[in-house]
């Protein structure tokens, strides 16, 4: 009898956990307005700094899964993101990246369709600087930010957010006879995003 009751208790607990921990795959697309803040630092025989700042548009696509908990949701996704070229005088910077992101959506309860969220991501970034010559390289890309989701139906949600994004620091060294130069590139962006998500 005790074994039967214990087994019944385990089954009930598993059922309760299953109902409290559900997940659904989703696809998402976002448009963004990015305040590109790119810096080049030169050291060696010559020293100096240059900033290539511009405001550009961009976009991203993502696939992921939402894990529904009792007091909020976790979202895990793989995202590809790209910005339009940031230009200044005769130079321009191209940036793109692939990120693995983790978000937490806060449930405000009381049937409110708004869910604030925070999130961070880590992945691969690529930047290309074109001017008198061309320099391009890959590096570690990171993002951190937050925003709010608006659930318009069971499957669709709008997303309004902000994030600080890095596209991978890298450097290049040059030797011209006795002249040595090292250029350090730091592509950054403050990004404001508007997106839509479809959850299956």
Regions found by a protein language model. Give the residues of each.
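Gram-negative (and chloroplast) outer-membrane scaffold detector with strong preference
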Residues: 59-130, 190-200
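Conserved catalytic-core motifs of eukaryotic protein kinase domains, centered on the activation segment
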Residues: 130-131, 171
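Cleavable N-terminal export/targeting peptides
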Residues: 1-24
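Predominantly the C-terminal beta-signal and adjacent terminal strand-loop region
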Residues: 38-42, 80-86, 152-200
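Short glycine/proline- and aromatic-enriched beta-strand/turn motifs that initiate or cap beta-hairpins
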Residues: 19-67, 122, 191-199
């Amino acid at each position: 009898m005790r074994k039967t009751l214990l087994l019944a208790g385990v089954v009930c607990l598993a059922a309760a956990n299953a109902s409290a921990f559900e997940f659904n795959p989703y696809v998402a697309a976002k448009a963004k307005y990015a305040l590109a803040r790119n810096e080049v630092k030169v050291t060696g025989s010559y020293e100096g700094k240059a900033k290539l700042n511009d405001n550009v548009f961009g976009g991203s696509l993502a696939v992921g899964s939402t894990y529904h908990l009792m007091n909020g949701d976790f979202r895990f996704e793989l995202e590809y993101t790209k910005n339009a070229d940031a230009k200044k005088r005769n130079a321009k910077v191209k940036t793109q990246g692939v990120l693995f992101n983790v978000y937490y959506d806060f449930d405000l309860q009381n049937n409110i369709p708004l869910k604030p969220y925070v999130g961070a991501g880590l992945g691969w970034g690529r930047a290309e600087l074109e001017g008198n010559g061309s320099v391009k390289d890959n590096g570690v890309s990171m993002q951190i930010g937050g925003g709010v989701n608006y659930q318009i139906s069971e499957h669709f949600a709008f997303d309004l957010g902000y994030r600080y994004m890095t596209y991978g620091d890298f450097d290049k060294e040059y030797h011209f006879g006795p002249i040595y130069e090292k250029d350090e590139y730091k592509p950054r962006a403050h990004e404001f995003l508007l997106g839509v998500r479809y959850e299956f």
